Amino acid sequence: MARPVNILGLVSKTHDTGLALLCDGQPKVIFEEERFNREKHTKKFPHRSFEILFNHAENSLADIDYLTIPWDTKLLAASFFRVVTGNMPASLHLLRPAAHATQDGRIVNLWMRLQIAMRRRFRSMKLPPLVQVGHHDAHAAIFFVSPFEDASVMVMDGHGDVCASSAYEGHGNQLRQTWQLGFFDSLGMLYTCATQHLGFKPFEEGTVMALAACGEPTYVDRFRDVVILEDDGRFRLNRDYVSVDRYGLLRPFTQKFLDTFGPPRLPGDELKDRHRDLAHALQVVTEEAVLHIVRHIERTQPSKNLVISGGVALNCVANARILRDTGFERVWVPPCASD
């Protein structure tokens, strides 16, 4: 009887680190490092997850046939340098770790840092072959555990290796990308930047989504100038307002944005009507952009089933709009939309 093929998925040097072990395609264990080190959305190498996997389960590193990570690091580095070299000298700020929220901050050399971390963990032990999976491909693969035999898949997050929004067709055991949209034209990135502008921390986007319900449509029309909808499901962030592709989170918005929507709120400051109204505008325009993409997918792909993945899939209000305002008959969002 042949030994089962063991594939170990690893998330490290980015947010929500952890492990997942598959044996002959079936999930055996899944560990989120934050459950052990008690640090929400931890970026630390999953040492405790490895300890539990290899010390308390019937596994060793020698049993692992392939190690996978949810990034194509060459494509990621190429995309990052394309942005940096295209917007110099201001974009040199993107090389500073503080310019990034969800990553370790040094995404350019992600693969090298991962190898160093693995060597520190396992010393001279032979490491299994590494398979790098495109970031949005990894998100889209959630289709395979969905309840659908066929579906359209929409992925939206901060950014992947080459894009921040993408669409796929899934049939049986096949998955094919059909559409994608730029690296820094990102609803996820915009929402994170606005979350910071409103005085909250990264990963508190859900708080801003809730705050939006308390706001008035004061800024909605003006915020539509920030996210410009275009043909074929595309949109772009207006660089007159958004400077995240030059400064990251160090200075994500331009002076024009500040003149239009007000200065940043400091953490702990009083929440005023203008903060609630800005959150409301952000949420409304985010929903409009999501629906713009979904309607393009609906027009160009035959399935009446939709799977949504990536960080923007956590925006439950936008998801409800998809069910209510599009022709998709069934929408499935994974309980865990992380990497």
Regions flagged by a language model, labelled:
Residues 1-339:
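Short acidic/glycine-rich loops and adjacent helix/strand connectors
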